[in-house]
Structure formats: structure tokens, C-alpha cells
Amino acid sequence: MNNLNVFTNEDNEMNVMPPPRVCPRCYSDQTRFSYFNNNKKSQPRYKCKNCCRCWTHGGVLRNIPVTGICDKSNLPKIDQSSVSQMILAEIQQGNHQPFKKFQENISVSVSSSSDVSIVGNHFDDLSELHGITNSTPIRSFTMDRLDFGEESFQQDLYDVGSNDLIGNPLINQSIGGYVDNHKDEHKLQFEYES
């Protein structure tokens, strides 16, 4: 036997494969027999090597594009590391905006000992939180420039530039401070706690 067009089914009956047919979509003669649809000899299934589509001889063609479906192995490969680098660069670019000028409101409460601290974006009594009343300030602000009303705390009005906040390793730690009354000048002093 030169051709392997003969196969057997479960009952060991010899069946001959049907001859190749012309593809009804691209009219190519490069087709091959795949199998019998529903194990009926009257419904042979073919696959076209040119357009990579299967069809049943004598059956109705479905409305499928001529280009057909590619195998997953033929799809273009996507380099996952380059995709993750692009996403990371886009996230970093979006996070590089300088704090949106502190659009959140800051609530203020001052104790009788005039000790005030910032925890997160809210002021609380420093002595109750940390038991500290005096510490070395890092940044000071004049009280007449602060607005303790219901308006938002604007970053650019208080000498806090975006360069002071970006890249600071202490920015994620709580900030403490106190009000100091020297020479009748009201100053609000802040420090970074380690």
C-alpha cells in the first residue's frame, strides 16, 4: 500500500478516505481530509492548508471571513517584560504630579500647651500622641500666612515646594510640630519624626 488513505473504525471495518476537494472559500486545491462529521460517511470534514479553514463537504458554509482563524501558535508573540515596563513607566509618569497642591482639607486643634502635630493630613495634640513637647524643627511657617478656616491648605503659599516633598525618604512618616511664641511672632514649626 503506497497511500495511507485507508483507516479502520471501532468495528475494524476498512474505510477509504475521500479524495481531496477544492476549498469553497479560497478555491485552493491544497486541502486534506480531517474526519467524518458525526461518524457519517456522507459528511466528510476537510481543512484547507491555504486559508486554514475547515468545512463539511456538502454542508452549508457559515458566514466566516475568508482570512479565517489563526492557530494560537501563529499569533504574534508579546514580550511580557516590555509590556510591564511600559505600564510601569506610565504609572510613574502619572504619579510624578506634585501632590495636586494639597486639595484636601486639614483640620486643626491646638491644646492648652500649644503643642500641635500633623498625623497624615490632620493635626492632633502632640503630647497625647508622642509625649514630646520640645524638639528640633526642620521647617517653620509664620502663623499669619496660615488660614485655619474651612479653605484648603495650598502648598505653594507656604514655602513647601514640590522638590521638598518628592524624593524625601521621610515623607511617608508622621510629621510632628509645635507652635512657638517667641518675640510675639507666631510660628508653626514642623519636624519629621523617625
Swiss-Prot record:
Binding site for Zn(2+): C23, C26, C48, C51
GO cellular component annotations of the record: nucleus
Keyword Transcription regulation: yes
Zinc-finger ranges (Dof-type): 21-75
Biological-process GO terms, alphabetical: cotyledon development; mucilage metabolic process involved in seed coat development; positive regulation of DNA-templated transcription; regulation of DNA-templated transcription; regulation of secondary shoot formation; seed coat development
An MF annotation (GO) of this entry: zinc ion binding
Subcellular location: Nucleus
Pfam families per the UniProt record, alphabetical: Zn_ribbon_Dof
Keyword annotations from UniProtKB, A to Z: DNA-binding, Metal-binding, Nucleus, Transcription, Transcription regulation, Zinc, Zinc-finger
PANTHER family documented for this protein: DOF ZINC FINGER PROTEIN DOF1.4-RELATED, DOF ZINC FINGER PROTEIN DOF4.2-RELATED
Function description: Transcription factor that binds specifically to a 5'-AA[AG]G-3' consensus core sequence.
Identification of the protein by name: Dof zinc finger protein DOF4.2
Organism: Arabidopsis thaliana
